[in-house]
């Protein structure tokens, strides 16, 4: 990262920190919150523009524009939320179910 690239490439928290807090991370210890924030399963290098669009959105409010990647992205969100015992809002769950119907064989990542 440098002066010209830092806005082009950013690190996305697949489960946004704010979303995590709202769905149970406030119950985690400081050590667990630090692990969550730095967990490679929850981190992706993405276009800065897309990270800005997503903000603290979940699957109900934002999905990757590349439709062929949505199953992977949603599966990753689910895996992260399960790992840290975070919950899903009803709209988020509905969006995830809708996406995963197109890829019923998709397994959740483990790391």
Regions found by a protein language model. Give the residues of each.
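Domain-level detector of nuclease and nuclease-like folds
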Residues: 1-111
């Amino acid at each position: 990262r440098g002066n010209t690239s830092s806005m082009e490439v950013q690190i996305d928290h697949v489960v946004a920190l704010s979303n995590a807090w709202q769905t149970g991370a406030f119950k985690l210890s400081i050590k667990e919150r630090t692990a969550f924030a730095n967990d490679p399963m929850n981190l992706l290098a993405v276009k800065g523009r897309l990270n800005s669009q997503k903000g603290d959105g979940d699957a109900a409010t934002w999905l990757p524009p590349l439709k062929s990647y949505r199953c992977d992205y949603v599966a990753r969100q689910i895996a992260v939320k399960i790992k840290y015992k975070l919950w899903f809002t009803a709209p988020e769950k509905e969006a995830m179910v809708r996406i995963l119907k197109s890829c019923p064989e998709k397994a959740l990542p483990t790391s």
